[in-house]
Amino acid sequence: MAKPPVRKPKKKVCVFCQEKMTYVDYKDTTLLRKFISDRGKIRARRVTGNCTQHQRDVAKAVKNAREMALLPYTSSAR
């Protein structure tokens, strides 16, 4: 039996490059929550589709937002 053809997954596009955003603001929690899992962890680059530089910027912004108590370090769900 022949295997069905495997489709290549679509390459994800960096949201920040697409919108031509140069700065990731740590105060924009609605944007940053898209890059955090339900457990409160920062999502990987292969999951979010960010480019390398913007993934670093997102990580720094999330860490700053956590320090300023805008985002939780962990989720409250158990």
Swiss-Prot record:
Pfam families found in the cross-reference section: Ribosomal_S18
Give me the segments passing through the membrane.
none
* Biological process, per Gene Ontology: translation
Molecular function as annotated in GO? small ribosomal subunit rRNA binding; structural constituent of ribosome
Q: Which UniProt keywords apply?
A: Ribonucleoprotein, Ribosomal protein, RNA-binding, rRNA-binding
Give a Gene Ontology cellular component term annotated to this protein: cytosolic small ribosomal subunit
Quaternary structure note: Part of the 30S ribosomal subunit. Forms a tight heterodimer with protein bS6.
HAMAP family from the xrefs?
A: Ribosomal_bS18 (MF_00270)
The similarity comment for this entry is: Belongs to the bacterial ribosomal protein bS18 family.
Say what the protein does. Answer: Binds as a heterodimer with protein bS6 to the central domain of the 16S rRNA, where it helps stabilize the platform of the 30S subunit.
What this protein is called in its record is Small ribosomal subunit protein bS18
Task: Name its species.
Answer: Thermobifida fusca (strain YX)
Q: Which gene encodes it?
A: rpsR
